[in-house]
Amino acid sequence: MTAQQLKNSILLMAVQGKLVPQDPNDEPASVLLERIHAEKERLIKEKKIKREKNPSVIFKGADNTPYEKIGDEVRSLADEVPFDIPDSWEWVRLGNISSYAETKQKVNATSADPSIWGLDLEDIEKGGRLLEYKTVGERKAVGDKTVFTKGDILYSKLRPYLLKIFVAPDDGICTPEIVPFRVYG
C-alpha cells in the first residue's frame, strides 16, 4: 500500500465514523439539524436570508435506502451515497447546513477600504495553510471581489477536489475564484 493509498484509507474510515468508538450518548445529528433549521427560520424572519423554494430533505426509506424529497418529487440516492454512516449521523446537502448562496456579496476592490485583507487564490496552500496575508492596498487590487467574514470557510471553485480550503481568521475580500460559505449551528 502506498502512502497515498494509506492516507485515502484513513480519510475514508474517518468520514465513515470508524476511527473512534461511536458513543450512544453523543447527540445525534438530527438534533443539530433541528437547531440549524430553527436558526435558518430566525434568519428568514429577520430577512437576512431567503427561504429555499424547494428544500432538499434526505431520509431513509423502509428498505433502509436513502431517498431525497425536493418539492413533490422523491428519488432514490442509492447511487449517490458512497458508504454507510453510523445511525446517529445523517446525510444532508451542503445548502441545508450552510449559507453558501447568501455569501456572494460583491464589492469593487477600488472602492474597498485599503486596510482590509485581500485574499488571492495563490495565498492558500493545498491543505489549507495561509502563505501570504496582504491588504487590499498592498495588492493594488482591482475588479470585483467577494466579501467574507471571520470564520467563513473559503475554498477554491477551480479545484473541485477542495485541496485549497481555509477558515478565515479575519474579515476581508477575495478573488471570485474563492467561494466563501458559513456553516449554521
Regions found by a protein language model. Give the residues of each.
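Generic recognition of stable, solvent-exposed alpha-helical segments in well-folded globular domains
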Residues: M1, Q5-L6, V31, S76, ...
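Proline-centric
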Residues: T2-Q4, M13-Q16, F83-V92, I178-G185
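Generic, well-ordered alpha-helical scaffold segments in large soluble proteins
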Residues: Q5, S9, M13, R35, ...
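Short, well-ordered loop/turn elements at secondary-structure boundaries
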Residues: Q5-K7, V15, A112-D113, F148-K150, ...
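Extended, domain-scale alpha-helical bundle/helix-rich regions
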Residues: L6-V74, A78-E80
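Non-catalytic DNA-recognition/assembly elements of restriction-modification systems
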Residues: S9, K18-V20, S76-Q105
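DNA target-recognition patches
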Residues: P66-R75, G95, V107-K140
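A short beta-sheet element
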Residues: G143-T146, K150-G185
